[in-house]
């Protein structure tokens, strides 16, 4: 298999994407347009579809230290949903997370829940997906290491064929402005 050379660009991107999920969610192009409308500085890296951190590790990214891993979890009563966003090289122990943050027992949310709440498929989970959470059910638990200099984070634009690099503070502001809660958490 040939090596894929992703490229990075500033601002908008002229590609079409197909939204295979809910019709009311922001697709990749709409995310780019939304970020431009908010006058945010961002950078885009296009790459083949990736469904795991192992697959993403095979892609040459401009800021691999800022790439995010996202875990969409729920409590045992399916009342509370959390998006745990950590640096890509970290592991999250859900039992330790639950104990430290006082949640009920946590497990991974189903693909159906992911689609119903954030309009995403497995492999495309991203903090930008909470912009599709009309009921503001998802609380984002963001690894505080993303706040350290240079304060950059790489997340999917609701599609696993690209990574958007933006300031962590801008991402927090977007999510908060939408009405979802953002927690800064320490993940060892």
Predicted regions, residues:
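Extended, low-hydrophobicity, polar/charged segments
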Residues: 2-4, 9-188
